[in-house]
Amino acid sequence: MLRWQTAGESHGEALVAMIEGLPAGVRISTDDIVSALARRRLGYGRGARMKFEQDKVRLLTGVRHGLTLGSPVAIEIANTEWPKWTEVMSADALDHDLPREGRNAPLSRPRPGHADLTGMRKYGFDDARPVLERSSARETASRVALGEVAKQFLDQAFGIRTVAHVVALGGVQTNPDLPLPTPDDLEALDASPVRTLDKEAEVRIIERINEAKKAADTLGGVIEVLAYGVPAGIGTYVESDRRLDAALASAIMGIQAFKGVEIGDGFLAASRPGSQAHDEIVVNADGRIDRLSNRAGGIEGGMSNGQVIRVRGAMKPIPSIPKALRTVDVLTGESAQAINQRSDSTAVPAASVVAEAMVRLTLAKYALDKFGGDSVAETRRNLESYLASWPEHMR
């Protein structure tokens, strides 16, 4: 069983991520993780923090000479700005009082759309600092690091590869008639400032981001993650909590600021008659079972069906808005403008990298549930044995 967990605060000394249940023999390096984290910092419309935020990575446990050991893998991502925050974020009690100004000024004006107010109520804080430190999207760096480990495992054990791109941002839609990107397009997508292969839409999206920046506003959008090479039969219809589509939806919705998710044609399928909403089964020229379309997004009955898995997520505009919204100062009870932490005009391109990591982690878990072994070699043999058990025309 694959399990993962993250720990750490946005301005704490470090983020820590751990993944347990990974087979022995997965090739992984510190450089792989550093490269993945660099992709998370890409994207037009990012704030000043991305310019100086560097990710210093250490593989602490579970890896020896570039190969996983089968024991828990722990990763540390150090905060290079920690010297500025040592007292404000000190784990130990201080022997002196800090002035309530600058970095230690009380954050008593919660931001609409953020975890601030409800977090303060839930945990009994009179300051939003403890809430925003953990609820910050900085935490996603941990998940991207773990997602890189999952990426290497999926590719090496199963030949599963993923890619993510932006399909809408700030109300600008990319052309749905363009071919879907493949993992071979990763370099081109990373080179795009808004992570799309649609050059016409790219220009219009950049214009929208510039407009939002001038207006001191923020923009949301829609991303899509595609998974290639997923064998049929991952997940199950037997119990609702073991359905693959349910797990993927949960993984995407667990990303900060995501408010919607769909598999395949999703909400569009709801407006079609049944005769135009499903993927007809045919025998192709090679005498094998095939499909005429992929409206289901590679998942039927809670199981992967062998086609490309398509998952989309909708991200709301970032609630840390330079043009601050109205709120209440919880210390005075008076109307006020919300606090404005350093933020981006949009983080949709970067969020696609996070979403890709979450899809990888979910697929790794479910693939291990089906084919798991103690080593990559054993896991691969289990997959090959499973596929060989099918009749020739069903492979």
Curated annotation (Swiss-Prot):
A cellular component term, taken from the record's GO annotations: cytosol
InterPro entries associated with the record: Chorismate_synth, Chorismate_synth_AroC_sf, Chorismate_synthase_CS
Catalytic reaction list: 5-O-(1-carboxyvinyl)-3-phosphoshikimate = chorismate + phosphate
Start and end residues of each stretch annotated as Disordered: 98-120
EC number, as in UniProt: 4.2.3.5
Cofactor(s) it depends on: FMNH2
Keywords: Amino-acid biosynthesis, Aromatic amino acid biosynthesis, FAD, Flavoprotein, FMN, Lyase, NADP
GO molecular function: chorismate synthase activity; FMN binding
Keyword Ribonucleoprotein attached: no
Residues annotated for FMN binding in this entry: R134, S135, S136, Q256, A257, G301, K316, P317, I318, P319, S320, R342
Cofactor note: Reduced FMN (FMNH(2)).
Annotated SUPFAM superfamilies: Chorismate synthase, AroC
Any one GO BP annotation for this protein: amino acid biosynthetic process
Gene3D superfamilies noted in UniProt: Chorismate synthase AroC
Family label: Belongs to the chorismate synthase family.
Subunit structure: Homotetramer.
Function: This reaction introduces a second double bond into the aromatic ring system.
HAMAP family registered for this protein in UniProt: Chorismate_synth
Protein name: Chorismate synthase
Source organism (scientific name): Bifidobacterium longum subsp. infantis (strain ATCC 15697 / DSM 20088 / JCM 1222 / NCTC 11817 / S12)
